[in-house]
Amino acid sequence: MPKLEMMLLVLLILPLCYIDAVGPPPPWNMEDEIIEHWQKLHCHEISDLTPWILCSPEPLCGGKGCCAQEVCDCSGPACTCPPCL
């Protein structure tokens, strides 16, 4: 096989091996982007988010989100947050 044909064959096969090794790209998830945007808006002033992660009962924020200290209400037995926007 001539060098040019061999080089073209390698160039065709190489990307296939790379895709197989890495796997397909993860599906786009708008919810993750919304959570990340919400955190950038509301969580930047909190250095340790751990105490505030359980603060919000909203599904959008639960586990991944947090409340800013000034809007988090911990006066009752559990902390609560206003609804996520």
Curated annotation (Swiss-Prot):
Keyword tags: Acetylcholine receptor inhibiting toxin, Disulfide bond, Neurotoxin, Postsynaptic neurotoxin, Secreted, Signal, Toxin
Subcellular location: Secreted
Tissue-level expression: Expressed by the venom duct.
Main location: secreted
Propeptide span(s): 22-40
GO cellular component terms listed in the entry, alphabetical order: extracellular region; host cell postsynaptic membrane
Keyword check for Disulfide bond: yes
Disulfide bonds: 61-74, 66-84, 67-79, 72-81
An annotated Gene Ontology molecular function: toxin activity
Stretch forming the signal peptide: 1-21
UniProt similarity note: Belongs to the conotoxin D superfamily.
General remark: Negative results: Very weakly inhibits alpha-3-beta-2/CHRNA3-CHRNB2 (19.4% when 10 uM of toxin is tested) and alpha-4-beta-2/CHRNA4-CHRNB2 (18% at 10 uM) nAChRs subtypes. Has no effect on alpha-3-beta-4/CHRNA3-CHRNB4, alpha-4-beta-4/CHRNA4-CHRNB4, alpha-2-beta-2/CHRNA2-CHRNB2, alpha-2-beta-4/CHRNA2-CHRNB4, alpha-7/CHRNA7 and alpha-6/alpha-3-beta-2-beta-3 (CHRNA6/CHRNA3-CHRNB2-CHRNB3) nAChRs subtypes.
Swiss-Prot/TrEMBL domain comment: The cysteine framework is XXVIII (C-C-C-CC-C-C-C-C-C).
Function text: Alpha-conotoxins act on postsynaptic membranes, they bind to the nicotinic acetylcholine receptors (nAChR) and thus inhibit them. This toxin weakly inhibits alpha-9-alpha-10/CHRNA9-CHRNA10 nAChRs (IC(50)=3 uM).
Listed name of the protein: Alpha-conotoxin Lt28.1
